[in-house]
Curated annotation (Swiss-Prot):
Descriptive protein name: Chalcone synthase 2
The organism of origin for this protein: Secale cereale (Rye)
Higher taxonomy: Eukaryota, Viridiplantae, Streptophyta, Embryophyta, Tracheophyta
Pathway where this protein functions: Secondary metabolite biosynthesis; flavonoid biosynthesis
Function field: The primary product of this enzyme is 4,2',4',6'-tetrahydroxychalcone (also termed naringenin-chalcone or chalcone) which can under specific conditions spontaneously isomerize into naringenin.
EC top class named in words: transferase
Domain of life: Eukaryota
Length: 394
């Protein structure tokens, strides 16, 4: 009779040897592109708010200061004309919004996932886990189920659906995928973040400028990554290693950012001191993450930071004395896509590895070995992921 394995032996056999690794990245946006310079006129016209001349001027200044050149939105003029309640500040419109996002969120996620799977180059039957994240609508079965069907993944794929997490969740999905990949030998985790602003779009109101800030910043996009440990480098090409991941709630930050799903859609509120709260606590997060590595020079690591808005990036840069180049990839994504909530950091990761190759850097992290990825969002919650780059291959 063969000897039975001990629990310890089973446990060891179940776990990977090395760290979780990003093996492919894909991104997608809706076809409809809106340019920030034209947006105030369009926004006040479509919401029938041109009579609010002073508010329109304030909104123009917000858009001018946003450092955003263009955004992509599923909501076209035709869709908004057909759904006038979505153009009001507070009118019952949840059904119309839900009808859009429960279809379009998985569809946009599929487009990003297909690109990631194509780059990965392996059969989709090798995908063992799916983590799907969105703050755009809620449904049962969820967007994870819809995407599984759309992509033809195995019925036994192990799914995790994350709804209503907000802008920090691009870090959350990486943290979860890291644990899944490292604790399940041979696992290949498809991670998808898909965000569509149809849940948050609304007309202006004089007494709620924080809502107007969101209208100036948010855009639509989806990003997908494939994560696994112990890559087979004869058929898989590592991009970044996920070395550590943590989450924390910032002190004295309750109510700084929140969102509420109501009959009128998802309402969004933020306090003016959000950039200050984040910048005040950023160094502590960096120290906690990098002390085990003996790193305390924040210009010696590459940066992927959720671009909640230009003020956050400016204040973080000032607080830790960052060179302007460190946030180059982050600011590029803000400029070209706006704030796409959870998808942003994955877009930035994609931009960084592509630009590192184009600029002749030796690693996927702009020539540096170590890097940090930050997600900021409701709570205030901060996700901190320590990354290690890999050598750039031709």
């Amino acid at each position: 009779m063969a000897a039975t394995m001990t629990v310890e032996e089973v446990r060891k056999a179940q776990r990977a040897e090395g760290p979780a690794t990003v093996l492919a990245i894909g991104t997608a946006t809706p076809a409809n592109c809106v340019y920030q310079a034209d947006y105030p006129d369009y926004y006040f016209k479509i919401t029938k708010s041109d009579h609010m001349a002073d508010l329109k001027e304030k909104f123009k200044r917000m858009c001018d200061k946003s450092q955003i050149r263009k955004r992509y939105m599923h909501l076209t003029e035709e869709i908004l004309q057909d759904n006038p309640n979505m153009c009001a500040y507070m009118a019952p419109s949840l059904d119309a919004r839900q009808d859009i996002v429960v279809v379009e969120v998985p569809k946009l996620g599929k487009a990003a996932a297909q690109k990631a799977i194509k780059e990965w180059g392996q059969p989709r039957s090798k995908i063992t886990h799916l983590v799907f994240c969105t703050t755009s609508g809620v449904d049962m079965p969820g967007a994870d189920y819809q995407l599984t069907k759309m992509l033809g993944l195995r019925p036994s794929v192990k799914r995790l659906m994350m709804y209503q997490q907000g802008c920090f969740a691009g870090g959350t999905v990486l943290r979860l995928a890291k644990d899944l990949a490292e604790n399940n030998r041979g696992a290949r985790v498809l991670v998808v973040c898909s965000e569509i602003t149809a849940v948050t779009f609304r007309g202006p109101h004089e007494s709620h400028l924080d809502s107007l800030v969101g209208q100036a910043l948010f855009g639509d996009g989806a990003a997908a990554v494939i994560i696994g440990a112990d890559p087979d480098e004869s058929i898989e090409r590592p991009l970044f290693q996920l070395v550590s991941a943590s989450q924390t709630i910032l002190p004295d930050s309750e109510g700084a950012i929140d969102g509420h799903l109501r009959e009128v859609g998802l309402t969004f509120h933020l306090l003016k001191d959000v950039p200050g709260l984040i910048s005040k606590n950023i160094e502590r997060a960096l120290e906690d993450a990098f002390k085990p590595l003996g790193i305390d020079d924040w210009n010696s690591v590459f940066w992927i930071a959720h671009p909640g808005g230009p003020a956050i990036l400016d204040m973080v840069e000032a607080k830790v004395n960052l060179n302007k180049e460190r946030m180059r990839a982050t600011r590029h994504v803000l400029s070209e896509y706006g704030n796409m909530s959870s998808a942003c950091v994955l877009f930035i990761m994609d931009e960084m590895r592509k630009r590192s190759a184009e600029d002749g850097h030796t690693t996927t992290g702009e020539g540096m070995d170590w890097g940090v990825l930050f997600g900021f969002g409701p709570g205030l919650t901060v996700e901190t992921v320590v990354l290690h780059s890999v050598p750039v291959t031709a």
